[in-house]
Amino acid sequence: MATQRKHLVKDFNPYITCYICKGYLIKPTTVTECLHTFCKTCIVQHFEDSNDCPRCGNQVHETNPLEMLRLDNTLEEIIFKLVPGLREQELQRELEFWKKNKPQENGQDDISKVDKSKADEEGDENQDDKDYHRSDPQIAICLDCLRNNGQSGDNVVKGLMKKFIRCSTRVTVGTIKKFLSLKLKLPSSYELDVLCNGEIMGKDHTMEFIYMTRWRLRGENLCCLNCSASQVCSQDGTLYQSYPMVLQYRPRIDFG
């Protein structure tokens, strides 16, 4: 009977180590464009100076590469099971970090589990943009319900009471869908299609991308003006003022 070969942890190192810091992947985060994975902290810091993947050199996103990152919780669990003591070491490092950085707010040197979770939430909030992207170029949007005579019963989607909104050009279709689900009080399992000019938009499409590539305005509706609160900024810095961009929504249609 052939003996089974035992694999050492180092045999898996090419798959569980970070290309940037050369250590084990902590909070593994994958770039959706090329599927390369890095530590969350490493790749976020890298994207502060570059829009390219540090491993293959491909451009991840023209303006905001952070939109193309996804946490890989499954890989994280695999790494913790492969490397003895790594989970405990990481939890200890995180605890020590909050002890050093949050003593004044907690009023004590020792952070309990409850205090630690609060500190984690506060840390996440501090990393968010304080002005909620209000300093970004803004775009006016009309969210119009696409009426369909085929809708019936629970499949009917109503129109919004206030269908005009103003948001950052970096907002994605996925965020718009969440906004609609919240406003229309739809169940979490309910899925919507968002369309522009009759074409279904992908969840990662930004409002800027849709405006520049799908929202086909006629010449008389588009004029270059001086800077004002209602203007939209294009990628080359040109400012435009126009009628709101119209996005339509409807219950998702399964073509399969």
Curated annotation (Swiss-Prot):
The keyword Metal-binding applies. Detected in hematopoietic stem cells and multipotent progenitor cells. GO terms for cellular component: centrosome; Golgi apparatus; nucleoplasm; PcG protein complex. Disruption phenotype: Combined disruption of both Pcgf3 and Pcgf5 causes embryonic lethality; there are no live progeny. Male embryos are detected at 9.5 and 10.5 dpc, but are smaller than normal. Female embryos are already extensively degraded at 9.5 dpc. Placentas from male embryos have some parietal trophoblast giant cells, but fail to form a labyrinth. Placentas from female embryos lack trophoblasts altogether and fail to form a labyrinth. Defects can be attributed to the observed lack of monoubiquitination of histone H2A 'Lys-119' and lack of Xist-mediated silencing of one copy of the X chromosome. Residues 110-120 have a biased composition (Basic and acidic residues). GO terms for biological process: positive regulation of transcription by RNA polymerase II; random inactivation of X chromosome. CDD domains: RAWUL_PCGF5 (cd17084), RING-HC_PCGF5 (cd16737). A zinc finger (RING-type) spans 18-57. It is found in: Nucleus; Nucleus, Nucleoplasm. GO terms for molecular function: histone H2AK119 ubiquitin ligase activity; zinc ion binding. InterPro entries: PcG_RING_finger, RAWUL, Znf_RING, Znf_RING/FYVE/PHD, Znf_RING_CS. Keywords: Metal-binding, Nucleus, Repressor, Transcription, Transcription regulation, Zinc, Zinc-finger. Residues 102-133 are annotated as: Disordered. The keyword Nuclease does not apply. It holds the Pfam family RAWUL. Component of a Polycomb group (PcG) multiprotein PRC1-like complex, a complex class required to maintain the transcriptionally repressive state of many genes, including Hox genes, throughout development. PcG PRC1 complex acts via chromatin remodeling and modification of histones; it mediates monoubiquitination of histone H2A 'Lys-119', rendering chromatin heritably changed in its expressibility. Within the PRC1-like complex, regulates RNF2 ubiquitin ligase activity. Component of a PRC1-like complex that contains PCGF5, RNF2 and UBE2D3. Interacts with RNF2; the interaction is direct. Interacts with CBX6, CBX7 and CBX8. Interacts with AUTS2; the interaction is direct. Identified in a complex that contains AUTS2, PCGF5, CSNK2B and RNF2. Selective knockout in hematopoietic stem cells has only minor effects on gene expression and hematopoiesis, probably due to functional compensation by Pcgf1. PANTHER family: POLYCOMB GROUP RING FINGER PROTEIN (PTHR45893). This is Polycomb group RING finger protein 5. The gene is Pcgf5.
